[in-house]
């Protein structure tokens, strides 16, 4: 399905899920679709960059450890491109170190969700982030550090 077809209903959010694990992509796809969102899937970082540039999703759920191009590089590339720099990024990862979380903050991520995660809570979090960004509240969202979007420091 083309990105234009997926944008046929502008009222529906379009989320790009970039993760090399098919079960994670499927879990996100099902839960976001049930909530009325359209979902694009990328199995590696290179594909994620291409889809973000060609489809302009409302949000990217981004794994860190992917083949070809890792999530860090994807976030850097999207942030450097004027076509994609305003797309909110929420990391969805098993990497739980404080250093990784801080690096995500520096890259401008709006969230850092640890795997395993509660899939039922995913759609409400995505909706919250997209709506707040649409109201110009991205900086406030970064500063709030909601426990649903940012885990507590793990190393003190």
What are these regions (language model features)?
Residues 8, 131-156:
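CheY-like receiver
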Residues 19, 63, 93:
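Active-site residues of response regulator receiver
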Residues 117-127, 138:
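C-terminal output helix
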Residues 55-61:
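Active-site beta3 strand of CheY-like receiver
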Residues 110:
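Short, glycine/charged-rich "phosphate-handling" switch motifs in NTP-dependent
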Residues 66:
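Receiver (REC) domain active-site loop signature in two-component systems and cognate sites
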Residues 26-34:
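Charged docking surfaces used in two-component/phosphorelay signaling
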């Amino acid at each position: 399905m083309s990105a234009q077809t997926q944008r046929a209903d502008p009222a529906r959010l379009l989320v790009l899920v970039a993760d090399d694990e098919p079960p994670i992509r499927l879990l996100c796809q099902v839960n976001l679709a049930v909530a009325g969102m359209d979902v694009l899937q990328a199995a590696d970082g290179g594909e994620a960059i291409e889809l973000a540039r060609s489809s302009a999703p409302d949000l990217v759920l981004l794994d860190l450890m992917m083949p070809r191009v890792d999530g860090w590089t994807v976030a850097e590339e999207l942030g450097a491109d004027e076509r994609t720099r305003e797309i909110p990024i929420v990391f969805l990862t098993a990497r739980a170190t404080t250093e990784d979380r801080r690096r995500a903050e520096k890259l401008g991520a709006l969230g850092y969700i640890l795997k395993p995660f509660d899939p039922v809570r995913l759609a409400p979090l995505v909706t919250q982030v997209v709506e707040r960004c649409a109201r110009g509240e991205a900086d406030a969202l970064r500063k709030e550090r909601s426990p649903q979007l940012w885990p507590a420091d793990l190393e003190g």
